[in-house]
Amino acid sequence: MFFYGTLMAGFDRRRRACIDDRLHYIGRGAIPGALFDIGLYPAAVPAPDGHVWGEVYETSDAPRVLAALDEIEGYREDDIDRSLYRREQTDVLLPDGASARAWVYFYNAPLGRAPRIASGDYLEYLKGR
């Protein structure tokens, strides 16, 4: 799993409390993409010209964790067009230079005039606001 927004450490994680015991923190990582500020949380979209920084986790129970995250992120496997986010497996670059595959929730709605977060790092961005 790759978290780049309010599911990361440092935020109120009550929304993910039901799966915390099934997640094992691996470390920071980055995916190819662009990050935007859409208000209460960020939105990542695939993009070849940038990186989105976040946290990488392993899970001991992928079906249960994905079901919970699908609910949190508004992802409907049977109706992707109406989903707020879409779930995709993506390559994540780890700090040691290795890469891993992880599930990522990409924003699936119009961005409007949302400002791009140039650093791709939501935590860093919030510290500067």
Question: Where are the regions a protein language model picked out?
Answer:
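Glycine-aromatic micro-motifs
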Residues: 1-129
